[in-house]
Amino acid sequence: ELGLPGEKSGFVPTRAWKQEHFGKPWLKGETLLAAIGQGYVLATPLQLAVMTARCVNGGYAVMPKLTRNAIDEGGETANAADFPKIDISARSRQILMHALDEAMNHPRGTAYNSRIMDPGLAAGGKTGTAQVRRITMLERESGVKKNKERPWRERDHSLFVGYAPVDQPRYAVSVVVEHGGGGSKTAAPIARDVLKEVQRVYAPGKLAKREADR
């Protein structure tokens, strides 16, 4: 929690929740939908960034702050190891980080065209495309219009979550472009520019010099 008005909680549905609210049992297909963030799943851009950070930082439940540094109760600068661990195995983290790396740096990855090619600055991440309207079976049979052929309000949202650098993560980012279309076309290039610039400006050597000059 940032302590700002308007914050919203995320939501991951359960079998009990669906039964209580709709009086219907959970379907196997809904598990697959939830796994890719569809169906009843809700998340804000900030929550997506926090999720990414927690998965790649060693499994520590870091919390975002609107300050230059996160300060603990003793007045010391907090780091990831100061936070509790989340319930994710080392094996699961390894698989996830490899997948995020491949999605951005493998030629067949969905974000390959937005990869960072500067030595030592490579990022990992995943594109996302959020459907904003229901597509009927009749539309599917007759042919669904391409995103750019639809009215703006019916176009998909463009998403991307990522982190950098891939070998020693320090930064996490999420980008959501409303009605921006596919994640690889709109959100991923923005995230690439952000991750590249933050690594350039806050390179470890530059950070050490700034702290020494303070």
Predicted regions and their residues:
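Extracytoplasmic/secreted cell-surface and envelope-processing proteins
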Residues: 60, 182-186
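Short, gly/Ser/Thr-rich active-site loops of penicillin-recognizing serine hydrolases
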Residues: 75-84, 189-214
